[in-house]
């Protein structure tokens, strides 16, 4: 009988190397004990994954392991080098730059460095910023002071910068503009990043995510400027105010906008080409310019946490004639509306008469205002196929029964609509 280990050893080296590539490098090295054939096979693995947590968060042992394995590694090119340091590690702070330099010398294509902030910032070598083979670069909790030097990422297509600190306000635009082939960009800002306005000018960019969630940002002068003519998907989350100006974004088909800006007219007025839109605003008064039509919008998700959110819903269903899917959900803690706030039902929108097929409401509470909105949609959505109502988990059995009774007895415009109470 042939043992399992023998059957595995009969596989070709290329196939085995692909399997080993997806394991932590610490586990890959253990395979060298299997047999003579396996003794040096690990040295040709094209993907190296180092994680401090797998070494019991012991810094010296981790640094020694990475040093030794990189020195013994013999693959002429590296598909990826992934370094994750989840706790403060003073020895690694000094060594990461050396490890990255080795990766650059091995023509690395994907580089990821994630670090838990320590007393000393991790500094990356200058050779990284002119690496011609790099296609994916992901950095977290890194200081990019050396980016003030010459920067040229001619092959870079994916760039993720999470909680990164820069030399000055011009460092980030300099990095972005150096990526002539960039298609995917993620920027998550952090306090003390030395940036006031994030400027994104990228002719080839297709997906963009911008996040600012820390309360350390204050004032209206922190924000984003976007000029991305080829962009298809955009995700903007800003919970601490500021602004976002879009100069050129005519081809966006999918957008997530979750912000607390007082005025979003310029932002939403620039993405009228969207087909899918997820929206959470603090106000509906200046959401988008009057007369705007979302002529391509077929899928809308609207957050119900803002006061008078129903007014924004009214505008959107009136201005989205092709809407097929409507989803309502409270994503954040709701700001209580004025006791006198009332909902003015709209004239019958085209989307309800001709297109809406799916209506879903998550975390439904059954308040008077919510019942008004839900019954209006059920009554007038003539082509509605499915309505799914999901109560809040904290709702009592009696409350759920009342919600079900109210909605089940309400008139329905579609004789084929299936009402599901999840």
From Swiss-Prot:
Q: Where are the LRR repeats?
A: 59-85, 136-163, 164-189, 193-212, 214-238, 279-304, 305-330
Keyword match Ribosomal protein: no
Q: Which domain of life is it from?
A: Eukaryota
Record bears the keyword S-adenosyl-L-methionine:
no
Q: Which residues form the FBD domain?
A: 342-391
- InterPro entries, alphabetically? F-box-like_dom_sf (IPR036047), F-box_AtFBL13-like (IPR053781), F-box_dom (IPR001810), FBD (IPR006566), FBL13/AtMIF1-like (IPR050232), LRR_dom_sf (IPR032675), LRR_FXL15/At3g58940/PEG3-like (IPR055411)
Tell me where in this chain the F-box domain is found: 5-54
Keywords, sorted A to Z: Leucine-rich repeat, Repeat
- Name listed for the protein in its UniProt record: F-box/FBD/LRR-repeat protein At5g56420
Question: Organism, per UniProt?
Answer: Arabidopsis thaliana
């Amino acid at each position: 009988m042939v043992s399992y280990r023998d059957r595995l050893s009969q596989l070709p080296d290329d196939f085995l190397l692909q399997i080993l590539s997806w394991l932590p490098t610490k586990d890959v090295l253990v395979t060298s004990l299997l047999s003579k054939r396996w003794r040096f096979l690990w040295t040709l693995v094209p993907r190296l994954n180092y994680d401090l947590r797998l070494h019991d968060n012991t810094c010296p042992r981790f640094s020694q392991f990475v040093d030794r394995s990189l020195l013994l590694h013999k693959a002429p090119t590296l598909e990826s080098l992934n370094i994750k340091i989840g706790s403060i590690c003073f020895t690694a702070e000094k060594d990461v730059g050396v490890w990255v330099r080795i990766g650059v010398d091995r023509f690395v294509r994907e580089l990821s460095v994630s670090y838990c902030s320590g007393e000393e910032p991790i500094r990356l070598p200058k050779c990284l910023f002119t690496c011609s083979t790099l296609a994916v670069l992901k950095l977290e909790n890194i200081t990019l002071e050396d980016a003030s030097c010459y920067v040229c990422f001619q092959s870079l297509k994916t760039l993720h910068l999470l909680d990164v600190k820069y030399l000055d306000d011009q460092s980030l635009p300099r990095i972005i503009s150096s990526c002539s082939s960039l298609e995917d960009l993620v920027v998550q800002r952090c306090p003390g990043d030395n940036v006031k306005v994030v400027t994104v000018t990228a002719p080839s960019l297709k997906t963009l995510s911008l996040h600012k969630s820390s309360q350390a940002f204050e004032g209206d002068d922190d924000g984003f400027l976007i000029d991305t003519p080829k962009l298809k998907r955009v995700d903007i989350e800003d919970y601490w105010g500021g602004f976002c100006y879009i100069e050129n974004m005519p081809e966006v088909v999918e957008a997530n906008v979750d912000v607390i800006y007082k005025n979003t007219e310029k932002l939403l007025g620039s993405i009228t080409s969207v087909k899918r839109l997820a929206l959470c605003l603090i106000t509906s008064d200046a959401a988008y310019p009057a007369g705007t039509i979302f002529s391509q919008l077929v899928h809308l998700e609207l957050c119900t946490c803002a006061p008078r959110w129903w007014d924004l819903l009214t505008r959107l269903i009136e201005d989205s004639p092709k809407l097929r899917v409507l989803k309502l959900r409270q994503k954040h803690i709701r700001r209580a509306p004025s006791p006198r706030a009332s909902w003015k039902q709209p004239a019958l929108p085209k989307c309800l008469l001709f297109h809406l097929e799916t209506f879903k409401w998550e975390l439904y509470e059954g308040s008077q205002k919510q019942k008004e909105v839900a019954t209006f949609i059920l009554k007038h959505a003539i082509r509605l196929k499915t309505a799914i109502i999901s109560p809040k988990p904290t709702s009592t059995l009696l409350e759920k029964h009342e919600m079900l009774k109210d909605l089940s007895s309400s008139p329905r415009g579609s004789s084929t609509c299936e009402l599901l109470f999840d």
